Amino acid sequence: MREGELDFNFSTAKNAEKLDEEGRKLPQGMKFVDFVLEEEEQSIMLEIKDTSCKARGGDSKAVLAKQRECDEFPKKLMNDEWVAHELTPKARDSYTFLHLMKRDTKPIIYVLLIGSENLSPLDPALLVAFKDRLFARLCQETEQPWVRQYVIDCLVLTEKTWPLAFPQYALTRIS
């Protein structure tokens, strides 16, 4: 299965689905994570943010915009706007869909994979702090925490750390 330039081998998963498949009819106002994987003991909601994919079109304007995105990306990890306005709503909407389709019978882990090949090395402490803020937001978006905790854990990975967490799912960059 592929997302942009990242190709995954999910053949050992019990089930793997590209939830935000282009052309798929989505419920009004909902946004989904990229993939949902079902394993024997858990499900994984996988969101991919690949700052390293090539600029679309390849013209100088697109290349500059892509470079700006790479330069600005570490700042996204330092504030909560991305967490609150994009990542958490996608996770919640995806869970709501799974719940309404009676596919939330296993514990769910939320995984954010950052395609970071073209980024200057990301500070591991920055990623840990970001993961903690993301998980806290997934558990509590209002004054009170969710009574039903829909995500039991959260991981923030890069292409380099992906094989450490999921050696069973090969990841290859297709140029």
Question: Which positions does each model-derived feature cover?
Answer:
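Low-complexity intrinsically disordered segments
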Residues: 1-13, 151-175
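Acidic-basic catalytic patches of nuclease active cores, encompassing PD-(D/E)XK
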Residues: 1-32, 38-40
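Conserved catalytic cores of phosphodiester-cleaving nucleases, focusing on short active-site segments
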Residues: 35-37, 44-50
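Structural motif
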Residues: 42-44, 109
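Surface-exposed, flexible loop/turn segments at secondary-structure boundaries
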Residues: 43, 53, 118
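Catalytic cores of nucleic-acid endonucleases
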Residues: 51-114
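Short, low-complexity, polybasic intrinsically disordered segments
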Residues: 108-164
